UniProtKB/Swiss-Prot annotation:
Signal peptide: none annotated. This is ATP synthase subunit beta. Keywords: ATP synthesis, ATP-binding, Cell inner membrane, Cell membrane, CF(1), Hydrogen ion transport, Ion transport, Membrane, Nucleotide-binding, Translocase, Transport. InterPro entries: AAA+_ATPase, ATP-synt_VA_C, ATP_synth_F1_bsu, ATPase_a/bsu_AS, ATPase_alpha/beta_chains, ATPase_F1/V1/A1_a/bsu_N, ATPase_F1/V1/A1_a/bsu_N_sf, ATPase_F1/V1/A1_a/bsu_nucl-bd. F-type ATPases have 2 components, CF(1) - the catalytic core - and CF(0) - the membrane proton channel. CF(1) has five subunits: alpha(3), beta(3), gamma(1), delta(1), epsilon(1). CF(0) has three main subunits: a(1), b(2) and c(9-12). The alpha and beta chains form an alternating ring which encloses part of the gamma chain. CF(1) is attached to CF(0) by a central stalk formed by the gamma and epsilon chains, while a peripheral stalk is formed by the delta and b chains. It is found in: Cell inner membrane. One of its GO terms (cellular component) is plasma membrane. It is a peripheral membrane protein. ATP binds at residues 151-158. It holds the Pfam family ATP-synt_ab_N. Its main location: membrane. Its EC number is 7.1.2.2. It comes from Maricaulis maris (strain MCS10).
Length: 479
């Protein structure tokens, strides 16, 4: 381990310049100094010449002074990995932030490492059921794939990701890692207690400080933290997921909320590091930064990492460079649409915009594929007719088109579903629907078997049988 020492010569917000007398530390090396009696980690970003390196601080730099001694650790930032991390909340550098003592570990892993080579990658396609109708039918998720949840502010990305954690992590029984990147601290706190209440994690206060039996590790770098922490926290979480995949041969779930904040933090740092910005003010290395993270999230012959990433879409503009760059890496995209949430249909998933690489007959089966395409066809036809309806009214449509519109409105409402995590808002208990029941229900609506039921019966129900019961209840109330 190198113990080369330097001293701070300049501090510009989250960027700190350090001068060394001897050998300069390598790019991406971690340096350590003290600030207010706490260890502050710096990561080398640039060699400036004249024996000076420019570094990024992983915590607040208030109180740092020029001349303070800095030590080179001789390697990248290392974080604790292994079963001891499960049930704990850690910072970007692996420090505990849940007031439950040190994180027990037998080894540490670097947050920077190369992606698995071609010959280590696995390519089988297997569907990962989620219990959410619109997802399972129209944009099914692949086990070991990368999934993106796209949406503007307040359309339900975090609620959907929490429901996926609830549905998949509970049924799944494997290990999960949750990286909270630049999101609200309140949401992180809610998630932590929700996991304890649902039995996914154990409360250390009730088990003498132990979290044994927990199944999810949490790594947080929240909105109020410096850009250095937000730009690296996803990598810290990924290092833990890679340990479970490579060393223990597990299938791991890796949740990131929100991948846009990773890009945003990189953009802030890029300006502080003096790089010339590219389109819309983003860093010129946007695609490289994203690729370095995404290429490591993959399935190998040892185990798999299935990742679910929430992607904030600035001003609902899908062509913005940040979401557009993320699109290229994903196997399935679930697009949340404000117009759908305004109709009160939740989850507000856009059935025509959401896609999946594995929605093909060879993988999901002929019946599922055919039903999904028919549903999209009906909704597309309804969308095309909306201008005519707005100008001339429903009466001007042909009988066939009237039938299409009626079925489309039923399909639209049947795509809604009550969520477990939203029960406190809606008062309705959450429902998970098996894939076979989802396909059966939508096929029956497309075939016209339920043309006689009112469209209100299809809103916020689980299976098609629930819709029939709701229709009977509505009829009884109206009588």
């Amino acid at each position: 381990m190198s113990t080369s020492q330097g001293r701070i010569v300049q501090i510009t917000g989250a960027v700190v310049d350090v001068e060394f007398d001897g050998t300069l530390p390598d790019i991406l090396n971690a340096l350590e100094t003290t600030n207010d009696d706490k260890t502050l980690t710096l990561e080398v970003a640039q060699h400036l010449g004249e024996n000076t390196v420019r570094t990024i601080a992983m915590d607040a730099t208030e109180g740092l002074q020029r001349g303070t001694v800095v030590t080179d650790t001789g390697g990248p930032i290392m974080v604790p990995v292994g079963p001891g991390t499960l049930g704990r909340i850690m910072s970007v550098t692996g420090q505990p932030i849940d007031e439950a003592g040190d994180v027990p570990h037998t080894m540490k892993a670097p947050i920077h490492r190369p992606a698995p080579s071609f010959d280590e990658q696995a390519t089988e396609a297997e569907v990962l059921p989620t219990g959410i109708k619109v997802v399972d039918l129209l944009c099914p998720y692949a086990k070991g794939g990368k999934i993106g949840l796209f949406g503007g502010a307040g359309v339900g990305k975090t609620v959907l990701i929490q429901e996926l954690i609830n549905n998949i992590a509970k049924l799944f029984g494997g290990y999960s890692v949750f990286a909270g990147v630049g999101e609200r601290t309140r949401e992180g706190n809610d998630l932590y207690w929700e996991m304890i209440e649902s039995g996914v994690n154990k409360d250390p206060k009730e088990h003498d400080g132990s979290t044994e039996g927990s199944r999810c590790a949490l790594v947080f770098g929240q909105m109020n933290e410096p850009p250095g922490a937000r730009a690296r926290v996803a990598l810290s979480g990924l290092a833990q997921a890679e340990y479970f995949r490579d060393e223990e041969g597990k299938d791991v779930l890796f949740f990131v909320d929100n991948i846009f904040r990773f890009t945003q933090a990189g953009s802030e740092l890029s300006a502080l590091l003096g790089r010339i910005p590219s389109a819309v003010g983003y860093q010129p290395t946007l695609a490289t930064d994203m690729g370095a993270l995404q290429e490591r999230i993959t399935s190998t012959t040892k185990g798999s990492i299935t990742s679910v990433q929430a992607v904030y879409v600035p001003a609902d503009d899908m062509t913005d460079p940040a979401p557009a760059t993320t699109f290229a890496h994903l196997d399935a995209t679930t697009v949340l649409n404000r117009a759908i949430s305004e109709k009160g249909i939740y989850p507000a998933v856009d059935p025509l915009d959401s896609t999946s690489r594995i929605l093909e007959p060879r993988i999901v089966g002929e019946e599922h594929y055919g039903t999904a395409r028919r549903v999209q066809e009906i909704l597309q036809r309804y969308k095309a007719l909306q201008d005519i309806i707005a100008i001339l009214g429903m009466d001007e449509l042909s009988e066939e088109d009237k039938l299409t519109v009626a079925r489309a409105r039923k399909v639209e409402r049947f795509l809604s579903q009550p969520f477990d995590v939203a029960e406190i808002f809606t008062g309705s208990p959450g429902i998970q629907v098996p894939v076979a029941d989802t396909v059966k229900g939508f096929k029956a609506i497309c075939d016209g078997e339920y043309d006689h039921l009112p469209e209100a019966a299809f809103y916020m129900v689980g299976t098609i049988e629930d819709a029939v019961k709701k229709a009977e209840k509505l009829a009884a109330e109206a009588a």
